[in-house]
C-alpha cells in the first residue's frame, strides 16, 4: 500500500518487495567497494536484482532503467521540490507522483513484454517518449543546476568583495 501513497520513484522502490530490498541493501549496496559513486552502487544492486529475476531482456530494461530515473528524480528534487512549501509543494508533490507512475509504467512494460523485439516494437510505437523526455529533463536539469551554482558563486564573490571593500574603507578612515 505504501507504494501507491509515496510521492517519489525512490520511495516507491523502497516500499516494493521490502524483504528482497532489505537483502539487496545489506548484501550488495552497503558492501559495494566504492561508497563515492552512488549511481554505481545503485546500478550494481539493481543489476543483481535483474539477474535474480532471470535472463530476459525486459528484466534488464526495466530494472536497469531505474538508477537513471532515480538520479533524474534526485536532481529535480534538489532543484524544485526540496525547498518548496505550502500549495507549491503540494503541486510539485502531485507532479512527482504522476511522473513516478509514468516511470513505473514505462519501465514495467519492458518487464512484461520480456523479449527485445517486443520491447523495441512497443517503445517505437510510442516514439521512445519516456527515454526522450528523461534525456531532455536530465539535460535541462544539468543546465539549471549549473546556472544555480554559477549564481551562488557570483553571490559569494560579491559578498566576499563587499567585505573586502568594507575592510579597506575602515582602514582608510
What kind of region is each of these model predictions?
Residues 1-173:
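Non-catalytic, membrane-anchoring transmembrane segments at the edges
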